[in-house]
Amino acid sequence: KPQDVLPDHTATPETSATVAPTAAVVQATATHAPTDTTVPTILPQTADAGRSYVDDTLFIGDSNTVRYTMYADDTGTAFSTLKNNIGVVSMGAGSITTLKCEKFKGDSTLYTIPDAVAKLQPKRIIIGFGSNNLGGSSTDATKFIAQYREGLAAITKAWPYADIIVSAIPPLDQQRDNTNLTMTQVDAYNAALVTMCEEDGYKFLNTAEVLRDDATGWAKKDYTLSDGVHLSKEAVTAYF
């Protein structure tokens, strides 16, 4: 098993946090039964499951996933580390199967996400793409879902013993830099993700429960950086 996973060179942290040196993805065994079918597709909000749950989880996604390694909890420990995080800046769902973005310590080969998952063999995956697939107000998520579905199928084929949880596209701030990004599209894409999860047997993590202001329909105050898209430390803390 590799000692470290190095993010794509574009995923450069903007701030630093103390990384827990003992954190590691705990491998699932070939007898591990993924996805408890008694749990509803949309996972309900629950109490904090503790650090062991986080350390047993492989987080996959775009620059917001990178931020899980950049911010720390109140003990000074990063929410996730390079050992259980595959976050790539500017990546969308269409690149899951094709983009060679991951390197392992002592190995010069670049791996796609499915190939990296096969090497890490996690017990659980929380995957979040979609922010880089947005643009305009169209509510037609057909292409987005087809790309996501293909990526998830490739991950499942590479390592079929992990529970897969699809994380919602996070809400935007009303005062965002790119006004071509709309909550109309975010909501439509998230609804399509729920349907995909229901049809394909994945679970859906509705992060809007903690990130969205129900009164406005946008992200809660101070939950994004100044661009109105990337999650702030406050938001990541609430997420975890």
Residue positions per predicted region:
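N-terminal secretory targeting modules
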Residues: 1-60, 64-70
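Conserved SGNH/GDSL esterase-like catalytic core that processes O-acyl groups on lipids
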Residues: 51-146
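Loop/turn elements at helix/coil->beta-strand transitions in domains of secreted/extracellular proteins
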Residues: 53-56, 120-125, 159-164, 199-203
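Alpha/beta-hydrolase-fold catalytic nucleophile elbow
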Residues: 128, 167-168
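Charged helix-capping and loop-helix junction motifs
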Residues: 141-151, 183-189
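Catalytic His-Asp segment of secreted/periplasmic serine-dependent ester chemistry enzymes
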Residues: 171-240
